[in-house]
């Protein structure tokens, strides 16, 4: 099953509101947000032995990369919005 089939309803809803590219970016951003929450939750239960209260380095790196990807996607959405607004 493709990503388009798995997320058909969300894609349809967002593409209707934001256009095809904006809708797809919005759904990608939602998926990254969900992944960020899941990895963050995992980090709560898997603590760093050397730094109590902090997630292990691999989880911290994944969290940082997902947050960076979200920021880039958000910037593309904002650029697209500013180009469409006169």
Task: Place the predicted regions along the sequence by residue.
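Long, low-complexity or tandemly repetitive, helically biased scaffold regions used
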Residues: 2-86
